[in-house]
Amino acid sequence: MCSSDLRESGKARYIGVSNFSPEQIDEAAKYCPIVSVQPPYSLLKREIEKDVLPYCIEHDMGVLSYGSIGAGALTGKFKERPTFEDGDKRGEFYEFFNEQNWPKTKAMIDTLEEIASSHGKPTVHAAINWVLKQKGITVALVGARTPEQVIMNAQAAEWELTDEENAKIEAAYAKIFA
């Protein structure tokens, strides 16, 4: 059963795609309306700003970004480059954890930590709020390993970054990743 059949039979109301390029979205849209896209997006992974995000804005599609806290890197948990347990592939899969990129990652974390702490909030809130402040983003999907992390992540919705704070993050990003 294909996605359009699921929609027509009432088993699915809407169809979204994950990790699609604009060209792939166009191809999928030939078969059924696509209402949302789920790409990776965070301060450490911004590739969608070049094509996917503008496409979604132009076509009025929802964007449910995943990886919004950079596989945990942007939580503020890691004060130095982490070493992961056997079976945890973050160190291999995410380039921002590697030895060469860690100093840049840490500098970005420090910027988020400074802003979040000025509100008396955890660093992860600034990372989530930055994603939510970006034009075209509908939802910032975040992972959690404990019930406490779920609550902490949800509490990010209790405040927002100011335009000045967002500009400070963007300036830091431009300097760090230039």
Give the positions of each predicted feature:
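Beta/alpha (TIM)-barrel catalytic core signal, keyed to glycine-rich beta->alpha loops juxtaposed to Asp/Glu
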Residues: S4-F177
